[in-house]
Amino acid sequence: MKVLNNVLSEDLIQEISKELKNKIQSDSWGTSEVFWEPSLRLNSTGTVLISNCSDRIQKLLLSELENVLPEYSEVFVKYHLWQKGSAISCHQDMNYKFGATLYLNDVWDLNWGGIFVWKPNDSNTMKAIAPTHNTLVVNDESELHFVTPISYNTDTFRVTIQIFAPI
């Protein structure tokens, strides 16, 4: 697992924020109940809203991340809005060359949950990272990982961009 801080320019972060602000009010969202396998929704009492990034944002994003993402021939780039109670169960992203998560919240309190936890392939010790603004986590070794449930005591979404490159 690679954890990279401050990966995007502030200009692109602002462009993403504008698109998200407009998109949140639209009807272009699906849910984890529809898109995720049941095994990924164990222990989750909430849902994640999922929507494609625009072609423009995807192009800008992938251009800025060109030197940090593994090579790929095809890639999916989606916004995820993690609602109260949402989580994702232990899994390894086995059908993907890599999976990556970009954290977009300006502020995230540890008490709100949504902690990304993984088990390095060469260790029995789990590691974890709190959602941190403009941080990218790249899983290119199919490491076991999960996200802890989002607290019902938060009034905000856990906002991420998910990037997946199929095998």
Language-model features and meaning:
Residues 1-69:
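Non-heme Fe(II)/2-oxoglutarate
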Residues 62-167:
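Catalytic core of non-heme Fe(II) oxygenases with the double-stranded beta-helix
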